[in-house]
Amino acid sequence: MPHALPPLPYAYDALEPHIDALTMEIHHSKHHQTYVNNLNAALEGTPYAEQPVESLLRQLAGLPEKLRTPVVNNGGGHANHSLFWTVMSPQGGGRPDGDLGRAIDEQLGGFEAFKDAFTKAALTRFGSGWAWLSVTPQGSLLVESSGNQDSPLMNGNTPILGLDVWEHAYYLKYQNRRPEYIGAFYNVIDWREVARRYAQALA
């Protein structure tokens, strides 16, 4: 089965006032759908058409050269957004506890230090891109950023939290005020989902 746009786990207006309904609708139904359509078009008729997008990104070097750029741009866009929708919730916010909370304390210097590092990654990403909390192959937490639709999967890391800092993610509400958008994101992070992804990455 070709790649498909995943349904949002909440209504387009569910993250108001932090992320507005119109942005969510355009971002999901137009931008993400375009990545899915372009990925399917690029892979049509190839042995890779039904491979999970995460596998394609992890094995990029093994793909035919003509497929690599479409997979990075559109497969990355599909994978990144598919994660992004699920790590937000109208019941989000607060801070992580359990194993993830302890790991952030021990490896990243505590929750406030994590927020500082993650905010810096999002703020200093020039142009379009993402900020990430990832798990390395050694099982360590890493705050990183990537340009355009590049995914941490391409470097062997497993993203468990991502923030889209492309202008289409925030411009309708925040215009050029990226710092406000980043601050608002902390109010909708679903730390239970991030913790689930953390446990899965370590398994």
From Swiss-Prot:
UniProt: Mn(2+) binding residues: H27, H81, D164, H168
Organism of origin: Pseudomonas aeruginosa (strain ATCC 15692 / DSM 22644 / CIP 104116 / JCM 14847 / LMG 12228 / 1C / PRS 101 / PAO1)
Expression induction or repression: By growth in a high-phosphate succinate medium; more highly expressed in mucoid than non-mucoid cells in both Y and LTG mdia (at protein level). Part of the fumC-PA4469-sodA operon which is repressed by iron.
Name of the protein in its database record: Superoxide dismutase [Mn]
Enzyme Commission identifier(s): 1.15.1.1
Obligatory cofactor(s): Mn(2+)
Gene: sodA
Family (UniProt): Belongs to the iron/manganese superoxide dismutase family.
Catalyzed reactions per annotation: 2 superoxide + 2 H(+) = H2O2 + O2
UniProt keyword Nuclease present: no
Assembly, per entry: Homodimer.
Cited InterPro entries: Mn/Fe_SOD, Mn/Fe_SOD_BS, Mn/Fe_SOD_C, Mn/Fe_SOD_N, Mn/Fe_SOD_N_sf, SOD_C_sf
GO cellular component: cytoplasm
Key words of the record: Manganese, Metal-binding, Oxidoreductase
Signal peptide residue numbers: none
